[in-house]
């Protein structure tokens, strides 16, 4: 018997859940940090971590598997060109979940999901300011 294996249902149909996790995964890979509820963040981590592990070996088969799950060519390119090489030496644990308190409307626990070892936004702003001078 299965006994509760797989992802949480999150009070959604299977199609809605798949689409939501796919959209959240694309957003996380694009922006490298997103704010969401804590249960969604924990499920997102279970989906994103294997994708980054897949990107560490850039074969055609792995790119096709990534496209099958992401359905976004730009994110597949970013995954294999930037994120795969960035985490080449890390054996796992590519995401970090930080608790951010509770949402005002319904008191839902909120969390920030971010990729570890991501470039600092403040450093990019300083580099842009230095280049402008």
From Swiss-Prot:
GO MF term set: structural constituent of ribosome
Matches recorded under Pfam families: Ribosomal_L17
Biological process (GO), any one: translation
Domain of life, source organism: Bacteria
Keywords: Ribonucleoprotein, Ribosomal protein
This protein's GO CC annotations: cytosolic large ribosomal subunit
Gene3D superfamilies linked to this entry: Ribosomal protein L17 (3.90.1030.10)
InterPro entries with a match to the protein in the record: Ribosomal_bL17, Ribosomal_bL17_CS, Ribosomal_bL17_sf
Subunit description: Part of the 50S ribosomal subunit. Contacts protein L32.
Family according to the record: Belongs to the bacterial ribosomal protein bL17 family.
Name of the protein in question: Large ribosomal subunit protein bL17
Source species: Polaromonas naphthalenivorans (strain CJ2)
Lineage of origin: Bacteria, Pseudomonadati, Pseudomonadota, Betaproteobacteria, Burkholderiales
């Amino acid at each position: 018997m299965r006994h509760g294996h797989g992802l949480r249902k999150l009070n959604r149909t299977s199609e809605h859940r798949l689409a939501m996790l796919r959209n959240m995964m694309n957003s996380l890979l694009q922006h490298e940090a997103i704010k969401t509820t804590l249960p969604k963040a924990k499920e997102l981590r279970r989906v994103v971590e294997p994708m980054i592990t897949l990107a560490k070996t850039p074969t055609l088969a792995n790119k096709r598997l990534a496209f099958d799950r992401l359905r976004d060519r730009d994110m597949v390119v970013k995954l294999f060109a930037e994120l795969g090489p960035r985490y080449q030496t890390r054996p796992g644990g590519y995401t970090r979940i930080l608790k951010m308190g509770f949402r005002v409307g319904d008191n839902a626990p909120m969390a920030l999901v971010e990729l570890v070892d991501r470039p600092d936004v403040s450093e990019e702003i300083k580099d842009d300011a230095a280049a402008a001078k």
